[in-house]
């Protein structure tokens, strides 16, 4: 025995096993479990299965011990009877074949019937009811020899698709079929000339035949085993050609079981093969579960006969406990499995019972579309599937994928490794799915940052199809349902191209699908959260700011009104008014600021929002109820809601947000008249205690004012009510005494549903943009009516808030300023702010002078930003920062309190905004006072100099900064009628990095260099702040890319020293500067959204920087013409005034006109007589021309004063002559030259060449071809560093 165990000869070992056959025949039938002990030596054939031997010894016990165990059965007791059992009854020996039959689970899976979800064809050719094979295509009729069944040929072409059913089948039976099928497909890898696989399934004869051409098994004797190779690999376990693991193969077979398992579980198994190289044809039959074999029949091949292999077997149905292949769903699964083979092996002609399965991978995948798109109603005919249903990509010759949407609510994967159907997926599927989920997740985060979405939520919406080739694949078991090979051992790296992922996201709308699912989940969470709300009869004492109606939550709940006020001051007004109508049916609840826009927000945010929770509780609302019946309305604590907000734009927005909240969750409430509003006057004109006029809109007041004269207007006292807090308690009682005049009911109207969604849904911004541009802004609400439709509220009132919000957020093309900035500049000019003032004091002055109503804190922030001068902020700040205004360390957020810092106008401000233009501006009016102009007229487009960022309603703007010197040069060329040759490139004052074109935008790169053994970073890309960048470096430390870093940063400069160990240094030395920039995230794109207001206050979305300059140029040149006209007219008046004054003083000094002791009227009469020399035409002038003469002092008659006035006159005439001889272009050119000289003297930065573009070595992501040129070695090194 020892000799046999140490002998590698397979035949000797087999003979030894036969030696114990007598013992095996006497085994006790009570044996229920088998413990396996290997007696094969280490040099014997090894297998990846749990069975590694050719002889088996079993022990009758229930232990899981791998080796010997004597664990007793539950009911056994230690006794003499137990211990005296025959040793032969305990220990048994099995041959490998017997062990396969005894324990099939370890080899082919269970041989018991199971029920599971499996993919099958919609119109199988196997008709179980009729027991016929129905071929749908012409000329493919197949006869099945049987006296009880027939083959039917049908002319109808039903829709063919693959869908899941609850299939009943035997996994082991499917597996033995699949083993032969995969072997046939594997042969294509061995012989590229192989062209077909033909499968014949005859269920009535219990016969399956699989044939393929191409080189098969050599018909030669195996010198070691002394038998034909065909017999060895088809009739002996653990034999085959796939045991050399040093050789990489992309086939399905690995362990030497394969076809032998099919043989063992068949009553009859035959192999027929032609070996053209040896000129022989081989035929051999096995029967009785491979127990009996016939001698091989070898004949010479005929002329023209080619290589092929044909396996025919009849499964042992008794072993599988079925009577026929027609039983259950096994035939449908075998059929679909052949479709898999056809889809994965495009170059092969695959046929089943003579019917060709003509599919490639794409057309195969589309067979699943009907189910994945949840299509339950389709016409019963062939359908051309939409190409955009799936995105396909051949990542490499080894990897083909299809990505689609799964509308079934769960992740769907269909995958194949070397033609093996990995039913449960594995590492290959996970590797690809993770890439898709990661990409989609990043896009979702950008578009729906407020939604809580986990990677698994995205994965549940995916359908992923994979057909790949993997070197020497490893599986979880012999059934090969799950690939376990590590990605690094695949033999290739399947990185999905970003272009394919982008196309999938665009065409599949997966972003919208996942976001929609998340919103539905939020609603479900809300339903759950409100299911335990207090009953309507319970007073809600926990909400401290609620003044509850006495009847709320009682039998008279539907008679109650909840007044929602804008803040506490409005609540006080409401409570004062309730003293008139009583507290039984009215409750009051103040909102803190604006209500949350409940659309497109995470459920967590909704559930944690105190205002939303309070309103829901106070009103007794339930997310389970739709409130579509009178009966359901009785569950509410209040019968209606009355909004009491300010009559300004923000008040309209608050109304809209309350409306949106109710519409989003309970639209039926709006349809049932649940919402009303309480309106108050915004202006009151009082003439006497009995003569008062109230106006609910500014437009109403302006219309009234146009109907009366200025003298009549002076008889009125005008009072502006900017907030409800302005009204007195007496006025509140007046309002509530006449509720009909102040309460307006909202009613449903056509398009109400769509308009409310349009106004508040984030994904409808394009519609909002068009709505804002196309709506007539002259329209307004008539507050004399008693009812307003929701569409009218949206189109005539809320639109004004949207417009005002855009005015606050979107800059002017002409001066580059937003209203807040313009107010600050106006107040600074008005105050002549050349001396420092505290920022907090300036903001107070601005609010006072410009009627600013949004809080001084907002002004403080704007003032600080207008004074920022660090890299990435302003190229030309208009205010001076004196103190800590913030630095590039934290992007300006590190500024000191407004109480401690000072500012004043920068000298350059008046170079840019020439004082001569001030009289030409159109100054706005508010509360009867003149405030800032609608826009200033700088001499260069400040929109490009300092850039702008802003988000409005339905639109946003993002404009980079450009060099003022470049802009001046461009304007100079235009003024000289020359074409600008250079294209403007973004420029940031003090920036040391590079800026280069990148598709439709520009990319900014920082600076990193290898200095000695360290890396030094001396600049960051625009928009990345020093403190924030340390997170990037810490992440690289965690990934062992760098050792550590040191900081030498200042408030104005960047200097990081990166410390490296020897290994890291070696890796860095092999990277180019571009690759270092990419690795250290020193590159960022500049956003270009060129949205702004033009000179007519129309929103424009421009396409290029040059278009901004063009429009600015036209407007600015017109204003230089206006300036010239104004100056000439002004100088004419000054010349006339000076001339008259000089003449008047001269006649007095000469004694021609005596003024002593005379009345003013007498002097005027003498001057108008024309009798005084030099004043002949005095009487022709209007009085305002000479009224100033009578306010002159006695000192003005002196010679010195007359000489001074004469010099002024000469100067004014010279100026008049100069301007008369000039044109608008020359005036503008002079201003530009003056500005350029000032800039070049004030800062050396402006003396440098501003058009700094990237060098040839800079990293440019727009150049995909450049990226492709990276060598595979270098790229792999970079990826390796990053992946660590």
Swiss-Prot record:
One Gene Ontology cellular component: mitochondrion
Cofactor section: Mg(2+); Mn(2+); Ca(2+)
Any Pfam family hit: Toprim
Chain positions recorded as Mg(2+) 2 binding sites: 646, 648
EC number(s) reported in the record: 5.6.2.2
S-S pairs: none
Catalysed reactions listed for this entry: ATP-dependent breakage, passage and rejoining of double-stranded DNA
Binding site for Mg(2+) 1: 566, 646
Limits of the Topo IIA-type catalytic domain: 810-1232
GO MF annotations in UniProt: ATP binding; DNA binding; DNA topoisomerase type II (double strand cut, ATP-hydrolyzing) activity; metal ion binding
Annotated site, Interaction with DNA, chain positions: 594, 597, 768, 818, 852, 858
Site keyed Transition state stabilizer: positions: 899
Subcellular compartments: Mitochondrion
Keywords for this protein: ATP-binding, DNA-binding, Isomerase, Magnesium, Metal-binding, Mitochondrion, Nucleotide-binding, Topoisomerase, Transit peptide
Site (Important for DNA bending): residue numbering on this chain: 951
Domain of life: Eukaryota
Residues of the transit peptide: 1-35
Name by which UniProt lists this protein: DNA topoisomerase 2, mitochondrial
